A protein has these predicted regions:
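Glycine/serine-rich phosphate-binding loop and adjoining beta1-alpha1 elements at the start
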Residues: 1-83
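Short alpha-helical segments and helix-capping/turn motifs at coil-helix boundaries
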Residues: 1-2, 95-98, 139, 162-168
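A general structural signal for short secondary-structure junctions and capping/turn motifs
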Residues: 4-8, 79, 101-103, 145-148, ...
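Generic structural signal of hydrophobic/aromatic residues within well-ordered alpha-helices
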Residues: 10-12, 16, 62, 120, ...
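Sequence-level detector for tyrosine residue identity
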Residues: 42, 52, 124, 157, ...
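Catalytic or ion-translocation cores adjacent to nucleophile or general acid/base/metal-coordination motifs
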Residues: 44-50, 54-64, 83-86, 92-152, ...
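Non-transmembrane, aqueous-exposed alpha-helical and coiled segments at domain scale
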Residues: 70-82, 152, 159-175
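Active-site proximal loops enriched in glycine and acidic residues that flank catalytic Cys/His/Asp
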Residues: 114-115, 157-159
Length: 177
């Protein structure tokens, strides 16, 4: 165990440490044993495999993933961000709702397609996206203006990602990520 703690009847009964394995026990064999016993799990990028906390738990990992993809695929130096780059993706649900904000933090202009307008309402109201539209032309216009200016933005497009990608292809819009 991570530790033993004095508590009372109203105290939480689980202290989450995800996959924290230290010292002599920091190897794959011991992790697999602890996971099989149900006392450790692989936490990935969020608050842990035992809980769901929505986009705030994934925004940092998504931001890092976008920056690293830019560095790996686009040759962006470690001291630069995604300014002047266009990121396209889909989904503004629970976990995917972080994509627009992560792209903005990373400096990219982005369009995130989502077919469920209620998801867009939520993300727009909460500030996870900065623009919303159901027009392919308007979504592209906003994102491309921001991209050209080197300014970040997150455009929520209410529609299918396939329609968005076809539109961008037909209009010779280069998608960086």
């Amino acid at each position: 165990p991570l530790g033993l703690f004095h508590s009372h009847k109203m105290a939480p009964r689980v202290i989450i440490s995800n996959g924290l394995m230290v010292g002599t026990f920091d190897d794959q064999e011991n992790f697999n044993r602890a996971a099989a016993l149900g006392v450790a799990n692989y936490g990935q990028m969020t608050a842990g495999g035992w809980m769901y906390i929505g986009p705030q738990g994934i925004v940092h990992g998504t931001f890092n993933t976008l920056l690293n993809a830019g560095r790996l695929k686009l040759g962006i130096p470690n001291d630069k961000d995604l300014a002047g780059r266009l990121f396209i993706s889909a989904g503004l649900g629970g976990m995917s709702g972080a994509q627009g904000k992560a792209a903005e933090i990373a400096g990219a202009a982005s369009i995130i397609a989502e077919v469920d307008d209620s998801r867009i309402d939520t993300r727009y109201t909460q500030g996870w996206v900065s623009h919303r539209t159901d027009s392919l032309e308007e979504a592209a216009k906003i994102a491309l203006e921001h991209q050209k200016a080197g300014k970040p933005c997150a455009v929520a497009y209410c529609g299918n990602i396939v329609d968005l990608l076809e539109y961008l292809y037909e209009h010779n819009v280069h998608v960086d990520l």
